[in-house]
């Protein structure tokens, strides 16, 4: 029995050592990088628009507890066919959240005609059973970003002295694949700190194990 116990302890120690070794092979950089967090309630539209959007969702019985509003527009839409009806069109673009974290590149767009729901673009998430804990450190994330920039971006050298920002959330690995099931993984979104939407380039996404999902410099996306 003692031999079995000792064998189990040795196996655990070996597994732990291997895990640490794998984690240590990731590039690290101790330069500037900050972690940011955008709660679902920190909308990027004015408070007046938030009230308007809340009313639209409420009046049309659309659940909005996991939606962060980042764009709102209103205009007159006229159909291209007789009788050429005109509608008061309101469009709301949102980020989706689950477990309090953003799902990257999983946005939705809602269109309302005369305050009534007209159509939705994008797939509604089914959520995830994954927790909100992460493994990667900020120096590792900065190291990964700089390594990706060096590999894919001709302007890589200018980012060596640039401060970065990192956001933890989830990513659907089947993004862009029609009719494919949603496969959410823990992920990080890395961009220059002073970049502002919609010009947050370059932007890189990594799984929480350090595997690159995509690197986009605004001209070309690399995976």
Region spans (language model):
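Sec-dependent signal peptide recognition
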Residues: 2-10
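Short, conserved catalytic or interaction motifs in soluble domains
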Residues: 20
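Segments that shape or occlude catalytic/ligand-binding pockets
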Residues: 23-223
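C-terminal motif of bacterial Sec signal peptides marking the signal peptidase cleavage site
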Residues: 14-17
């Amino acid at each position: 029995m003692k031999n079995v116990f000792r064998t189990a302890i040795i196996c655990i120690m070996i597994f732990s050592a291997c895990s640490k070794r794998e984690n240590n092979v990731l590039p690290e950089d101790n330069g500037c990088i900050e972690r940011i967090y955008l709660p679902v309630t920190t909308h990027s539209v004015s408070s007046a628009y938030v009230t308007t959007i809340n009313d639209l969702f409420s009046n049309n019985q659309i659940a909005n507890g996991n939606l962060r509003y980042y764009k709102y527009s209103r205009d007159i839409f006229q159909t291209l066919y007789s009788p050429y009806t005109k509608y008061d069109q309101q469009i709301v673009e949102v980020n989706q959240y689950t477990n309090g974290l953003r799902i990257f590149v999983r946005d939705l767009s809602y269109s309302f005609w005369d305050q009534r729901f007209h159509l939705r673009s994008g797939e509604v998430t089914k959520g995830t059973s994954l927790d909100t804990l992460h493994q990667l450190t900020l120096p590792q994330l900065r190291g990964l970003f700089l390594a990706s920039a060096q590999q894919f971006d001709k302007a890589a050298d200018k980012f060596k002295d640039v401060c970065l920002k990192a956001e933890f959330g989830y990513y659907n690995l089947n993004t862009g694949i029609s009719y494919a099931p949603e496969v959410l993984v823990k992920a990080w979104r890395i961009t220059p700190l002073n970049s502002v939407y919609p010009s947050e380039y370059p932007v890189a996404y990594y799984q929480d194990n350090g595997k690159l999902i995509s690197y986009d410099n605004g001209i070309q996306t690399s995976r």
